[in-house]
Structure formats: C-alpha cells, structure tokens
C-alpha cells in the first residue's frame, strides 16, 4: 500500500469550502510600542485557515506613503490589504496627515456598504502619532503608547505593559519579548517575529 501524497493547498481550501464551514484566514498578533521617542511595530508571521497553519513567515507590517508611515494589520487577509491600500490613498489625499487620514478612513469604513463588512484592524504610526483603526469606525489613540490587535493582542499588550513599567528595555526589545510571550500563549501566534520602527 502506498502513502497518499499531501493535498495541494488549493485542494485544501476547496475541501473547506465544500464542507460548509465559513473559514477565513485569521489569527495573528500585532503590537505597537511607543517609548523614548521611538515607535516600534511588531507582528508574528503565522497565517491560519480554520485550524490549519498555512504560512509561518507572513509579513503583516508594511511601510506606506513613501516609507513615512508604518501599518500593521490583523484580521481577514484580503480585507486588511484592501484597508491598507485605502489608508495609503487617504494619506496621499491629505498630504501625509495620519490623523486626518485615519479619521476619514474610519468614517468611510463605518458608512460604506462594501467596507462595512470588512473584518480587519489596523495599527498605524507616522513616528509621532499612533492609532488603532477598527471596523466599527473607531480611531483609538492610546494613553500609554501601547496598542495591540489580533488573537494574541491581549497577551502581547499585557506583557508590553509589564515590561515598560518594570524594565529599562528599549521599545524594540519590549516589542520582541512581548510578542514571544504572546506566541507562547496564543495558538494562532508564532515566534517568527517581524519588527520595524520609526
């Protein structure tokens, strides 16, 4: 008897579709740390489809608007890419004013019928301002310079707060350590960490 070869990825997706499950690509952790004049955005690399790990080293952090703005995203992948593109368009429209671009995107997201159903969160920074933009039309600016989204977001946020309060670590090291802790707890988060900073 011969072993059956592994199913190609496209067949795996079609099997999920035929099973009647409404599976989406999801699961990630994105963390933003603002400390001592630096802003760091970190994210893990895992992409899951239902309960299957599809990719280990996905890049969920992007530089947009001539590399002047960092954006991290969590949620449905296609939705997140669409929202990042719309945010970049708003940044172009408002000459790089992240505050105005974030508010306009959130308003559009909340009121536009097509956008309203997108399932994603964005973290964005221009090095001074930091925002979380949600699908409910919220633009949130943190009190403590820390933001996190995704399935492991609460773990990463708790770890980052503890490290900020009880250590002298720089922002980059805090982000890396907090993501590692989230990866130890959240099954949808791995330790293939991508970090970028402004």
What residue spans do the PLM features occupy?
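Conserved short S/T/G-enriched processing/targeting/catalytic segments and their helical context
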Residues: 15-116, 153-155, 162-169
